[in-house]
Amino acid sequence: VTNTLTWNAANTPSLLLLPPGASGEVRFSINVRRDYPIKRLGDKNFTLKVDAEIDSPTVPYFLAAQKTVGVAALQTQVAGLVSVNALAYFRDAASGILNAGPIPPKVNTPTNYTIHWVVKNYSTDVRDAEVRAFLQSGVRWTGKVKSNIAAVPSYNERTQEVVWPIGKIIATKGVINKPLEAIFQIEATPSVDQTNRYMPLLSETAVTAFDEFINAELRGADAEISTLTIDDPTVSPDNRMVKP
């Protein structure tokens, strides 16, 4: 495999004869990998490079050459990727935060859940990284929070928004080594009109960061969380709907 594409007069008739000053173009597209070839900490700042060359046997009379040749090169920087995974648990002793309340959830009775935000950064260094989500109606912030970095999530009671201001994340963080993780506890109290329904807990979780390699903003997200979609394997599907 030479990774070479060739155009000539046989497949591109316009190349058969080019008058002086003439111009033209050929186009092609390629598929790139769906993942980054990251195997060690230094694997970052990937680029796609194309070298182009055109030659002709026509040589000006004043040149002593076999052919005329023109060359050009194009190099494209590959954007990075920052991802967030939002998880929810009822039984979560490993986090160091103990939850209480009825399972299945019960009308007008509070049940605690722990929310985990797991962040990975792939092929570029990023700065100003931040994770955001909103608590849903009937959900309260308990104030129990922790993370494996200095910054922890904070809560705006007026807007019901939770924000985790991470800051700078080096490339391959969470891919080669342990990801960034924050944990906070919420208290959900279902209302009467949620009887025999699944209670929404957390809105879509969004992560943003500035890619220092391509000088552009990166965005990622994970789906909203309800009592139906919690990730706790100890809570069966039959015990996730709100009961009277």
List each model region and its residues.
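Surface-exposed coil/turn segments at beta-strand junctions on protein surfaces, enriched
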Residues: 19-23, 41-45, 69, 77-79, ...
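Gram-negative and organellar
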Residues: 21, 110-113, 137-140, 217-218
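Short beta-strand elements of extracellular/lumenal beta-sandwich folds
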Residues: 96-133
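A surface/secretory-pathway sequence property marking extracellular, secreted
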Residues: 1-17, 86-93, 128-172, 223, ...
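Low-complexity, intrinsically disordered segments enriched in Ser/Thr together with acidic residues
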Residues: 8-46, 51-60, 116-120, 165-214
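Intrinsic-disorder/low-complexity, polar/charged segments enriched in Ser/Thr/Lys/Arg/Asp/Glu/Gln
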Residues: 23-27, 71-73, 110-114, 128-130, ...
